[in-house]
Amino acid sequence: MREPEDELATLHQEGLLRSLRSGLSSDQLLSTSDGLPVVNFSSNDYLGLSRDEALVNAACEATGRYGTGAGASRLISGSLLPHRDLEERIAEWKGTEAALTFANGYATAMGALGAFLTSGDVVIMDKLCHACLIDGARRSGATLRIFPHNNLDKLENLLGHYRKKISENSRLLVVTESVFSMDGDRAPLAEIVDLVEKYDALLLLDEAHAVGILGSGGQGLAEELGLQDRIALQMGTLGKAVGSAGGYLAASRAWINLLTNKARPFIYSTAPPPAQAAASLCGIDIIASSRGVELRDRLWSNISRLSELLGKQPASAIIPVILGDNEMALRASATLLEKGYLAPAIRFPTVPRGSARLRITLSAGHREEAVVGLHQSLLNVS
C-alpha cells in the first residue's frame, strides 16, 4: 500500500510540494508569519473590496439579524432573504431572468455541468479552462472534447463534427472563460458566440476574472462586447473582485429552475452564511456605482503601468511571468518575498508542465511605487 510520506517525497523531488502560508491578511499590505511586511501581488481581490468598510458592515448587520449560519440547505429551510436579494441583484446586473448562488465557484461549475449534461451530450472546452470546469465536465457523463487554447478553427471543426453526430435531444455545450486565470488573456468571445449560434449549441461562459474589471458596470467581458443576450449560461464568482465569497450562475428562469432541482452541490450543502450573501450584494452595488468606476480606473492604471514596464499588452489584472522550471519559479518567488513582494510560484498541475511561473495579480489598492518596485525586483529574477 502506498504511504503518504512516499507521495510527499516524490512531490518534493519534483518541486511540486505545497504548504499553507499562515499569518497573512487579505489586505494589499500584509505581514508574513515571520513578521516581515510584504506587498501582496497574488490576491484576486482586484478592487480591494474584501476589507471595505461597507462590505464589513453589511456582513455584520446580516449576522446580527440572521445569525452566523443558514442552518440548512436552501431547499429545506436555509434560503434566507439575503440569498434571494443577492440572486435578484445578480440577475439584474447580468441582464438575465434569474440567478442561483453557490458556496464557491468550484461548486458552481460542478453543479451546473452536472445538472445540465448527461450521457449522450457533448461538451467542448478550451484547453486552459479552470480545473473546476474540467472536473465538472468529466463527472457529468457527457463526452468531453478539448480544443487548443482560443483556436477557433479547431472549435468549429469539433462543433461541426458533433452537431452531425449527436441526437436531436442531446445538448452540445461550449465552455470557455472570458479572462483565463493563469495567463490573463481573453477569449475571442464574439467569434465564439457566432460559432455557437451557427451550430445551434449552448455557451457557458465563466467570467470569474472579468467581473468587476470589464464592462460598463463591471459585469464582465460579455457586457463590454454587447453579447450578454446571446450567451445562455453566465457563470461567475463572488470571491474575487466582488470581495466576498461564493459563485453564481445567471441564465433564463428555466435554466435556473433546472439547476435548483438538479445541482447536487446546491441541493446537498448547507446554504452559505447570510453574511456572505449580504457582503456580496454590497460588493456588486459598489462595482456598479460611480465608485466602482473609480476603482476600475485605479486598477487599470496599475495594469497599464506594469504591462508597460514588462513590455506586455494590458489585457486583465493577471500578468504571468513564465519561467518554465519549477525550481526556478520557486527561487524567484523566494527572492521577491525577501524584497517585500508576495508572488507565489504557480506550478503543475495548476499550469502545464514546463510553464511554471509567477502569477502577478494587480489591485486597485496597489500604489504606483509598489508596482514600480515589483518590476525592479522582477528584473533580477526573470
Predicted regions located by residue number:
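N-terminal "arm"/small-domain region of PLP-dependent enzymes with the aminotransferase-like
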Residues: 2-68, 201
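Active-site phosphate-binding strand-loop segment of PLP-dependent enzymes
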Residues: 45, 145, 149-205
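PLP-dependent enzyme catalytic core of the Aspartate aminotransferase-like
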Residues: 53, 57, 61, 65, ...
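Conserved N-terminal alpha-helix of the aminotransferase class I/II PLP-enzyme fold
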Residues: 57, 61-104
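Conserved active-site segment immediately N-terminal to the catalytic lysine
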Residues: 200, 219-238, 256-261
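PLP-dependent aminotransferase class I/II
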Residues: 235-237, 241-313
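Conserved PLP-binding catalytic core of the aspartate aminotransferase-like
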Residues: 293-340, 350, 354-355, 362-364
